[in-house]
Amino acid sequence: MAAIEVGRVCIKTLGREAGNTCVIVEVLDKNFVVIDGGVKRRRCNLKHVEPTDKKVDLEKAASTEEVKLALDAAGLL
């Protein structure tokens, strides 16, 4: 299981959105990803997210609407 991949469901651990569920939408480099879902879409340091064992089916750079639909279909929102 690759922990850091597009579609991986994560929990924010730091910041004002700590505790919220999010999804990795794009991997930028070894330290940063773009997240969306239960949080505002933004670049995030990997040290600030905790990957879970859940994954939703998403394309790279999926829109916010596509992310919300995928989370609803998986019963995570």
Swiss-Prot record:
One MF term in the entry's GO annotations: RNA binding
HAMAP family linked to this entry: Ribosomal_eL14 (MF_00721)
Signal sequence extent: none
Similarity field: Belongs to the eukaryotic ribosomal protein eL14 family.
Source species: Methanococcus maripaludis (strain C7 / ATCC BAA-1331)
The name this protein goes by in its record: Large ribosomal subunit protein eL14
GO CC term (a single one): cytosolic large ribosomal subunit
InterPro entries the record matches: KOW, Rib_uL2_dom2, Ribosomal_eL14, Ribosomal_eL14_arc, Translation_prot_SH3-like_sf
GO biological process, alphabetically ordered: ribosomal large subunit biogenesis; translation
Keyword Coiled coil applies: no
Pfam families listed in its UniProt record: KOW
Sorted UniProt keywords: Ribonucleoprotein, Ribosomal protein
